[in-house]
Amino acid sequence: MGTPNPRTWSELPPDLLGSIFHRLSFTDFHRAKIVCWNWNLSSKLTVPKKIRSPWLMLFPEGDNEDGSVLLFNPEEEEKIYKTKRYFSGIRFLANSGKWFLLIDSLFNLYIIDVFSENKIDLLPLEESLLDKEESEDLTGLLWVDEKTAEYVVVLFFNFPSGNVGFCKKGDDHYTKIPLHCGVPWRLQGLIDAVLLGYRLYIRTELSYIRILDLSTQQGFEDVNKYEPFQVFSSTQDCSIAVTTRGEVLLVKSILDNTTIGSHRRFCIFKNIDYNPQEEVDSLGDEALLLNLGILLPSIAPNSIYFTRHGRIYHKEHFNLDLCVFNLETKTLKRFPSLANMKLKDAQWFFPGI
């Protein structure tokens, strides 16, 4: 039997390729479309299987010889995928859907689609924003519109005493956001933030909520139309989240340690400018990705997807807890296949956005 001609794979007829693509999982679909030009063209005529659940991006500890990171789909608990891209010396700062914000060892910033070769180079970092000796403290938030390719990048430099800057598609510089100088005392500082579209929601040092519109031509605009409201919280293990309607929620995490293990539970509150607050017992048909602070449609509605606290403050040591909490049944799900993995970090993301 002769050796198969490798060219024949790229010359398969479109109808046969379409039949193949229809049978592939979401991950294999995106792998297949970068095999060659013809496969990529055929993939555009095929609708991939719909993603119904958030995924985990896993970052292993220690030396990673091939520079890859791992992908975990909760619907396929026994499968862990490895990216084909080379990510040695690169830090993942934030994500929006399948797009991730990265910084490399030369301090270059860019956005990538983890399932394709698509890449967006960002503006060079300005010395006035970043002290490169403290670049390990750089964190960020990202929003990408899949339909229009518009994007917003928010960067947090050298916290807790540092700067905030942002850029959006078409900008030729980073715009600084003052946190103290010229800012009313209740709206000064930052301990938590959520980016939803062009709006940045900041929880200030005194736990007031500051809302910024980043879409203006002049840079940004404070849009607190009413008296800014204060978040009442007696615990540090809490985060803000924002609904699709722009309502700010407070999410509290409580870890109960016992002799037989630990159990984590969550409480969500709305009308958070009042005391006592109103507890939320349902998220409708949406789920909360707490590392992003936003709600999305999901196969598991009323669920909270959790990895760790601290979106903004980068810490060398923190406790990862990869779990999903059902708000209705008050039950917690962890993943046995990940229990023995040594990870330095993990992020939930939603490939289907």
Swiss-Prot record:
PANTHER family: F-BOX FAMILY PROTEIN, OS07G0183000 PROTEIN-RELATED. Coiled coil: none annotated. Residues 6-58 form the F-box domain. InterPro entries: F-box-like_dom_sf (IPR036047), F-box_BR-signaling (IPR050942), F-box_dom (IPR001810), KIB1-4_b-propeller (IPR005174). The lineage of its organism: Eukaryota, Viridiplantae, Streptophyta, Embryophyta, Tracheophyta. This is F-box protein At2g14290. Gene3D superfamilies: 1.20.1280.50. It comes from the Eukaryota. It holds the Pfam family F-box.
